Regions:
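Enzymes that bind and transform nitrogen-containing heteroaromatic metabolites
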Residues: 1-184
Length: 184
């Protein structure tokens, strides 16, 4: 299969101020939602590879032993460490990563963090599953994309990446949580 057979899906739950983490770099309780978590876990189970930042990897042990690609400036390029693959994007191009890890194509799940979301926006998402916890404002912390730190909305970044939104779906009415899937 060609590189076009690689299907990249991003996943994030964000606050009304487009944040994915608090000022300590952690996902706050206000962004944890059982309906979103169940959907997210199902999507990770469908993936052939999960691309995650080093901090996310350290904070979320790979208990289900999913095939994981950890993005880190500390990697030599593309290397295997235990059951995970580690990748330094500046040292090894994405096409080499996919040739090695997904030679027959497949689905890549991207759960973040910010630098990882930014990188895959450049590589090209097929879809981005954007969950929003309405009524939640963090006020400080990490935003979804670097451009959001400069005032852009998450939606404008996704639109600029060539994605278009489907109709929002309420996944938890009591908590006022919606999911919008943006697709190419």
């Amino acid at each position: 299969m060609s590189a076009s057979a690689i299907h990249i899906h991003g996943y994030a739950i964000i606050s009304d101020d487009d944040r994915i983490a608090d000022s300590n770099g952690r996902t706050p309780r206000s962004l944890r939602n059982e309906a979103d978590w169940a959907r997210f876990q199902h999507e990770l189970d469908r993936a052939d590879l999960v691309a995650i930042g080093r901090l996310g990897h350290q904070a979320n042990p790979n208990a289900k032993h999913r095939r994981r690609l950890v993005l880190s400036r500390g990697a030599a390029g593309l290397e295997q460490r235990g059951e995970e693959w580690w990748w330094h994007p500046a040292k090894t191009p994405w096409r080499e990563v996919t040739a090695m890890l997904l030679p027959d194509g497949g689905r890549v799940a991207v759960p973040g963090g910010q630098a990882v979301f930014d990188l895959f926006a450049e590589i090209g998402y097929e879809a981005f599953h954007l969950t929003r916890a309405h009524g939640v404002l963090l006020g400080a912390g990490r935003r979804l994309f670097t451009a959001c730190e400069r005032g852009a909305s998450a939606e404008s970044v996704l639109n600029g990446a060539g994605l278009r939104p489907a109709a929002p779906e309420t996944i938890d009415a009591a908590a006022n949580v919606t999911l919008t899937i943006w697709r190419r």
